[in-house]
Amino acid sequence: MKRLLREKIPAWFLCTIFFGLAIHAPLTVWVGAHWPDYALFVKAWKEVLLLIVLLLVVIDVTLCRQWQRWLSDRIIQLALAFALWHGVVALLVPTSGLALLSGLLIDLRFVALGVATYVFVSNYPQYRRWLLRMLGAGAVIVIGFAAAQLVLPRDVLVPLGYGPTTIEPYQTVDSNSTYVRINSTLRGPNPLGAYASTVLTLIVAYGALQWRRISHMRRWALGGMALLAALAVWQSYSRSALLAVAVGVGIVAIVRSWQSQASRRVVLWGAGAVLGCGVIVGSIGYAMDPHFIDNVILHNDPTHGPAQTSDSDRITSLQAGLTRALQQPLGTGVGSTGSASLLGNGQSLIIENHYLFVAHEIGWIGLLLLVALTTGILVKLWHRRSYWLAFGSFAGGIGLTVIGLFLPVFVDDTVSMLWWGLAALAITEDGL
């Protein structure tokens, strides 16, 4: 019975969360369309399971008398400080009940998953492979369906309940129907781009460290998955995701070149050659189809796009977010930004920068705590870069932090919980 409560149930629930993230969006839309009375509970299924896991982990730590060990851990200290600061802001700058609850879930769920996974897997490392396989299975679903959407009808998700009141089955680039942005099983093209960029970086890191040790069949499978992930990034038409891929894969390439004792001159020449090829290919592509570059890359095609593009919306959002954050250094309250703000005054305030998003809600102190926590995890991953999971999570995490400059990337549950779960597995790994 003790093993069931302290070991088996947390493992089952974490596996369910890790796999269920891949199908969370279509599941909640489908249930909401057919059984709207149960929609709210279904949306919170992973948070409910996570709360139970946290409770069981606390019980296990208490029974094992490990509090001194974990309270002296810098990652745990920063995570607790980040959570407690939310409580302080909630008292100092109160918001409505539903907005506060929604804001707490959005802000803390990925940190809670990372902490729960970190502590649980440290105590029971035999479940690390289980959890990693669940994340891998979820990635196959997300990337596989994204590839299928390249040939499926663009409204294939409508029968599940997708639409203007839930999640759009697809989007376009600045209202130009020529360029359709796919969602896969996520909440939109930008989350898909961020997710696929992380998966692609992990695959490249795995290949860079394990290529000589794996079979030819696995190499083909790895190459196929990398190609599909790259297609998913491309078809999302997310420029920030393309930048994240460049950063993540670039980190893997540069670090491996240095570790292989290649001369810096060779590395620099190689980087220059890749950049030069990119410029040449881009120039040829622009000459062949200037509308593609104008629409997808520059968002500046007057023949199709509206006068108000996503770029102009983003600039307006950044200006408003920075002004508000400077005016209210303690923040405007948990749940005052993003989708949670709809539950307060009924008006959603969107800030297209994750760091300004956090500063707007919980102030500059809250932002510093999040940056310190994320940096601490990245440092741990860097120190374990000889293992592919840690190396890939580090490079992918840097890519996501770059996306955060343009989008509130960690607001999306699937993307945020994917990376924080991966990072937790990686900083406890022993050579997967």
Question: What are these model-derived regions, one by one?
Answer:
Residues 1-6, 11, 267, 271-280, ...:
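A juxtamembrane structural motif centered on a specific transmembrane helix
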Residues 9-29, 48-112, 398-401:
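N-terminal hydrophobic segments of proteins, predominantly signal-anchor/transmembrane helices
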Residues 13-18, 220-229, 382-407, 426:
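Loop-to-helix entry and N-terminal half of a specific, functionally important transmembrane alpha helix
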Residues 26-27, 293-294, 298-362:
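Long extracytoplasmic/lumenal interhelical loops at the membrane interface
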Residues 54-55, 245-250, 392-403, 409-432:
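Transmembrane alpha-helices of multi-pass inner-membrane enzymes
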Residues 83-91, 112, 116, 129-258, ...:
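Alpha-helical transmembrane segments of multi-pass inner-membrane proteins
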Residues 144-154, 236, 253-305, 319-326:
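A membrane-periplasm/extracellular boundary helix in multi-pass inner-membrane enzymes
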Residues 184, 188-190, 230-232, 317, ...:
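A conserved mid-to-late transmembrane alpha helix and its immediate loop/hinge
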